[in-house]
């Protein structure tokens, strides 16, 4: 049985490969990063970010436009975990009573309203297929976000 440090090193190599593959497939991804800790080395997170670090609102990376994926190497699963938020347009607030008192909505919620299906938990067969699934989902969500916000820096919805 491998030690925790060995598991982190082994998983980090796989994550670097996955991040490289995602970066190649996603033209709107400015950076792809991962995190893997000693506390539970088999569960790692990949963040596909659509903003440059200097463009983060208030300099905080959690305020960015990103998708986070959870990769479990022990259970061999890949799933969507969370995303960044976009300010709602005034048109959406007027037309939808559920959104009237909200300031923001998640990127995935905006994409779901545009007809994109949510990513389901899937099996991690190999690095290439998992990276392709994550990249495809990121591209679909970003297409809906670009339509909603009219492009970079994806800050607020625009009335159309």
Write out the residue ranges for each language-model feature:
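Short, extreme N-terminal segment that most often corresponds to the first beta-strand
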Residues: 1-23, 27, 151, 157-159
């Amino acid at each position: 049985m491998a030690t925790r440090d060995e598991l982190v090193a082994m998983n980090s190599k796989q994550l670097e490969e996955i991040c490289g593959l995602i970066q190649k497939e996603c033209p709107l991804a400015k950076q792809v990063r991962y995190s893997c800790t000693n506390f539970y080395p088999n569960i790692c997170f990949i963040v596909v970010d659509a903003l440059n670090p200097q463009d983060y609102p208030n300099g905080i990376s959690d305020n960015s436009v990103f998708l986070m994926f959870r990769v479990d190497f022990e259970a061999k699963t890949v799933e969507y975990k969370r995303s960044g938020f976009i300010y709602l347009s005034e048109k959406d607030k007027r037309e939808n009573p559920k959104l009237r008192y909200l300031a923001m909505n998640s990127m995935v919620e905006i994409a779901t309203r545009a007809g994109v299906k949510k990513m389901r938990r899937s099996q991690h067969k190999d690095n290439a297929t998992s990276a392709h699934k994550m990249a495809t989902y990121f591209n679909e969500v970003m297409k809906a976000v670009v339509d909603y916000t009219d492009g970079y820096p994806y800050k607020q919805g625009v009335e159309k």
